[in-house]
Amino acid sequence: MAGHSKFKNIQHRKGAQDKKRAKVFTKLIREIVTAVKAGSTNPDNNPRLRTALATARSQNLPKERIDKAINSANDSANNENYTEIRYEGYAPGGIAIIVEALTDNKNRTAAEVRSSFTKYGGNLGETGSVNFLFKHCGVIQYPLEISSAENILETAIEAGTDDIVSDEVLHTIYTDIENFSKVLEFLTDKYGTAEEAYIGWVPLNTIIIDDKEKAEKLLKLVDLLEESDDVQRVFGNYELSDEIYEILQGSDE
């Protein structure tokens, strides 16, 4: 698929994500609870729960916390109810941003997201204002050393998809949303737990960020959005240039 953000963006984000592990776990649990309430506790007949569990395992959410979340959601006394919302807008430089949220207070979440965009010079638009610049699909990633690109492609084809990109550190497999769980299960049996596995928005084309100030501003916006407990994931159609990536990596050390 054209335009997927390359490994350097993923690697630069990973350090920040590791520091937010507790918050990431909280968001994964919220998705599991929502999936159970929307369907059942059986992932075999609840595709959303099956996807939520796959994502949680790829992020190393402990099994006891997964089980606790499922049991809690199935408890009639549990009054947690979250609504799915998607926000779309532009960061400075015409970078398209999609924000997926699960919230129990739409007004609060909308205010937080709008404030984040405004603080860093972006503009929150209407739903549908940028999603045409992305493909909504499943994303599964394995480290490069897990196998050769040829073997990964062969396995992916067996699993039901031939959309794979291998770069300097990652194999990325893309799937239709309907086949995501099946493909992930097949790959997991062959290669073990994926480094990343989720349904998200992959840019059809990317804008190269080759200015340090613009890159820092953009990443601060993404970080601020991700700090919200209600925000599940943030997607953008940008890619850091090699030079800017190296500069930012150096400033993080």
Swiss-Prot record:
**The keyword NAD is annotated on this UniProt entry:** no
Gene Ontology biological process terms in this record:
regulation of DNA-templated transcription
One Pfam family, short name: Transcrip_reg
The primary site where this protein sits is cytoplasm
- List UniProt keywords, sorted A-Z: Cytoplasm, DNA-binding, Transcription, Transcription regulation
Gene3D superfamilies for the chain: 1.10.10.200, 3.30.70.980
Keyword flag Cytoplasm: yes
Q: Name one GO molecular function term.
A: DNA binding
GO CC: one term? cytoplasm
Q: What segment(s) does the record annotate as region Disordered?
A: 1-21
Subcellular location, in the record's words? Cytoplasm
Q: Which PANTHER family match?
A: PTHR12532:SF11, TRANSLATIONAL ACTIVATOR OF CYTOCHROME C OXIDASE 1 (PTHR12532)
HAMAP family linked to this entry? Transcrip_reg_TACO1
Q: Which family does it belong to?
A: Belongs to the TACO1 family.
Name of this chain's protein? Probable transcriptional regulatory protein RBE_0568
Question: Which source organism does the UniProt entry give?
Answer: Rickettsia bellii (strain RML369-C)
